[in-house]
Amino acid sequence: MYILGLGIGALVVTFIIAVIVWTIVYIEYKKLVRQKKIDRLIERIGERAEDSGNESDGDTEELSKLMEMGHLNLGYVADL
């Protein structure tokens, strides 16, 4: 009887560890997807700024929403 209880306890601990690990993996995946979206928007804004300079306003607003910053001034971004 003692061995059965120990086995069930080990199974519960294993399940809890698996849930924690998969939660961390999911959070990191969401961060990665969000960063890729931000990188694509920055690249698109840079390309449009080279072409005309006026067509990237919608992308700038979307980028500022993703970065949770209010108004984003691209003049201060050094790596574009």
UniProtKB/Swiss-Prot annotation:
Query: Where exactly are the transmembrane stretches of this chain?
Result: 7-27
Domain description: The N-terminus and transmembrane domains are required for self-oligomerization and proper virion budding, whereas the cytoplasmic domain is required for CD4 degradation. The cytoplasmic domain is composed of 2 amphipathic alpha helix that form a U-shape.
Which Gene Ontology terms of cellular component type are present?
A: host cell membrane; membrane
What is one Gene Ontology biological process annotated in the Swiss-Prot or TrEMBL record?
receptor catabolic process
Q: What's the protein here called?
A: Protein Vpu
Per the record, the similarity remark reads: Belongs to the HIV-1 VPU protein family.
Q: How is it modified after translation?
A: Phosphorylated by host CK2. This phosphorylation is necessary for interaction with human BTRC and degradation of CD4.
Notes on how activity is controlled: Ion channel activity is inhibited by hexamethylene amiloride in vitro.
What topology does the record note for this protein and the membrane? Single-pass type I membrane protein
| UniProt xrefs under InterPro entries | Vpu (IPR008187), Vpu_cyt_dom_sf (IPR009032)
- Species for this entry: Human immunodeficiency virus type 1 group M subtype H (isolate 90CF056) (HIV-1)
Q: Tell me which residues bear Phosphoserine.
A: 52, 56
Q: Which gene encodes it?
A: vpu
What Pfam family is a match, any one? Vpu
Subcellular location field:
Host membrane
User: Please, which domain of life does this record's source organism belong to?
Assistant: Viruses
UniProt subunit comment: Homopentamer. Interacts with host CD4 and BRTC; these interactions induce proteasomal degradation of CD4. Interacts with host BST2; this interaction leads to the degradation of host BST2. Interacts with host FBXW11. Interacts with host AP1M1; this interaction plays a role in the mistrafficking and subsequent degradation of host BST2. Interacts with host RANBP2; this interaction allows Vpu to down-regulate host BLM sumoylation.
Q: Which GO terms describe its molecular function?
A: CD4 receptor binding; monoatomic cation channel activity
Extracellular compartment residues: 1-6
Q: Any extra remark in the record?
A: HIV-1 lineages are divided in three main groups, M (for Major), O (for Outlier), and N (for New, or Non-M, Non-O). The vast majority of strains found worldwide belong to the group M. Group O seems to be endemic to and largely confined to Cameroon and neighboring countries in West Central Africa, where these viruses represent a small minority of HIV-1 strains. The group N is represented by a limited number of isolates from Cameroonian persons. The group M is further subdivided in 9 clades or subtypes (A to D, F to H, J and K).
